[in-house]
Amino acid sequence: NEYNDGFSYDNWGGYNLLAKLNLWNPEVKNYHLETVKFWVDEFDIDGIRLDAADVLDFGFMKELRSFCNGLKPDFWLMGEVIHGDYSRWANNDMLHSVTNYELHKGLYSGHNDHNYFEIAHTIKRLNGIVGDKKLYTFCDNHDVARIYSKLNNKAHMYNVAILVYTVPGIPSIYYGSEFGIPGNKENGSDWNLRPDLNLADFNEKNELPALYTTLGHLKQRFPELTYGDYRELYLTTGQFAFARCLDGRAVVTALNNADNGAHMEINLPIGANKAVNLLTIDQSTEVQEDTCTDDATAKAWGNARNELLDKAGQLVGASGEIRYKAEDIRKALEALETGADFGQAVWNLFGNLNDTMNNMHRVIGEFEQTMHKQERNAVAAGGDCTGGESLEIRDGKLIVDLPANKGVVVYLTNE
């Protein structure tokens, strides 16, 4: 070792601070399993990220998965894997997900080279490998240069963000990327990638924070973006469109990475006669009355819904006890009392919350479905609401005109 004292041990990558542990030793293995149990019991954590999972013993990860399933059925295991066949780690026996470094590379090089074929090929290839498993999608992290520094044209930050949230996978944001901050490795050090941030330093007119906020809302509200089948619809070096389809519904992403405007005629993935730009709809929900059935319902999405779902998720504790009474849940719904049928319907759904655990789960599920239906009605009532983009459905095609280096997320509906 560096002290030349005759003491040594195996390490990772030549770094003595990263000791290589003998996971075949029962005491070492049990120590790690009990550590997980401590964090679940003490802090009710929901998952673990395994650093350098590509060098961990497969047998240990299988045992870890089984152990965690016994602690918490929905416990999530995600591993850092750089290269290789991701399905070797992300499968029903080991990890739920791994880092999608292959797509990470395509996100910046596909834009720098004006080559959407690379990104489209990567998505299709990975779908064929991992199937229904959702990979951990990112454009940068604490180990790689910031996406802002990697992109030749900083305007491409917009379309990169859209891709992270709309392709198959689990989107993630590395702090600061929502503002588009730069960062490169310096002399082999990662510290320049991990700065302290002062929010007062960032320009409020930056469009990226609002875009990320909108994309996060859409990911929550439209299950097509999480569970929908992926269908490639349109592909050139400079333009790319795909759909996420679920139960006869579709959300279409259309992108233009060229420095000039683009006209796209995209085959419809479903029967539809109306196209709505979700990026604009979501940003204007609280200020344009015609984009929602009424203002109180719109505000309820931003205020009462999060409180309600937080309480609903805690209704049943680890030992099965009821933590909140129905009255507590009803308080979270006060903002939904609009006098409309929707408000009454939600009220009725929560009438029997105290009956049984099964009934509670059913009610919560029905509430989510009702909220999704209400949101869809609001979207359909909102009109095209385009913001510089042009959308039209004609002769079985979605006609999209996009400005330079911009994209849209479109909800297709059949009125």
Identify the meaning behind each predicted range.
Residues 1-42, 64-70, 87:
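Substrate-binding/active-site clefts of carbohydrate-active enzymes
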Residues 35, 41-44, 51-135, 153-154, ...:
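Active-site-proximal helices and loops of the catalytic beta/alpha 8
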Residues 147-152:
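Short, solvent-exposed helix-loop connector elements
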Residues 168-182:
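Substrate-binding cleft of secreted/luminal carbohydrate-active enzymes
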Residues 233-269, 311, 369, 405-408:
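Carbohydrate-binding surface patches
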Residues 288-377:
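Long intrinsically disordered, low-complexity regions that are acidic and Ser/Thr-rich
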Residues 296, 379, 389-415:
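C-terminal beta-strand-rich structural cap/linker in extracellular carbohydrate-active enzymes
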